[in-house]
Amino acid sequence: MPPNLQRIFPALCLLGVLFLLHCTPVLCGCDNPPVVAHGHHTQIIGLFGMKKDEVVYKCDEGYTLVGEDRLSCRSSRWSPAAPQCKALCPKPQIDRGKLSVDQDEYIESENVIVQCGSGYGLVGPKIITCTEDGTWHPRVPKCEWEYPEDCEQVHEGKKLMQCLPNLEEIKLALELYKLSLETKLLELQIDKEKKAKAKYSI
């Protein structure tokens, strides 16, 4: 007997003649719907509470469905191919960093290239991948300010603006420099007064 006839079919015996009745795909025997990792399926209910030969897939929280969400039992097979539930990774938060693909969430196996803004250097991997557990691998890198060698002893002028990474730090440096000048001036005045007193006391 052919493999497709080795199933139990509904039949009708009429006047001594056996008739095989047409059966729906579900009765003819689709196996259980495919199991999807990190997801689940529900069977569609039709009119009068009858179960239809269709199932709908949904993913667990933190996962997104890739593929068709609805499968039908046709010719004893589920069609189309079962979907996948892939993990979602949050957007990497990298101060002074830029991402090759800028979006709120990333799908499992998606790669992102990290670049740092002007004056900042990358500490860590340049390429990171969204993994199946919803985390990034390797570890998310950092962007740190690169301190030029010729900036070590800079205290004032145009060079100061070139060496400091942003306007806020330039303002702070200038305020500190101004304070240091005022302190030196005060020290000179005190020293001058001391010398004057010493001169008159002789």
UniProtKB/Swiss-Prot annotation:
Give the matching SUPFAM superfamilies: Complement control module/SCR domain (SSF57535)
Record keywords, A-Z = Disulfide bond, Lipid transport, Repeat, Secreted, Signal, Sushi, Transport
Q: Name one GO cellular component term.
A: extracellular region
Disulfide linkages recorded for this protein, renumbered to the chain, are: 30-73, 59-85, 89-130, 116-143
- Signal peptide (UniProt feature, chain positions): 1-28
Cite the record's tissue specificity text. Answer: Plasma. Found on very low-density lipoprotein (VLDL), on chylomicrons, and in the D > 1.21 g/ml fraction of pig plasma. Found in liver, spleen, lung, bone marrow and lymph node.
* GO BP term (any one): lipid transport
Query: Where in the numbering of this chain does the Sushi domain appear?
Result: 29-87, 88-145
Where are the coiled-coil regions? none
Respond yes or no to whether keyword Nucleotidyltransferase is given for this record: no
Keyword presence, Phosphoprotein:
no
Q: Where is the protein situated, by its record's location annotation?
A: Secreted
Q: What is its main location?
A: secreted
What binding partners and quaternary form does the record give? Forms high molecular weight disulfide-linked complexes.
Function, as annotated, reads: May be a lipoprotein-borne regulator of either the coagulation or the complement cascades.
Q: What is this protein called?
A: Apolipoprotein R
What species is this protein from?
A: Sus scrofa (Pig)
Lineage, top ranks = Eukaryota, Metazoa, Chordata, Craniata, Vertebrata
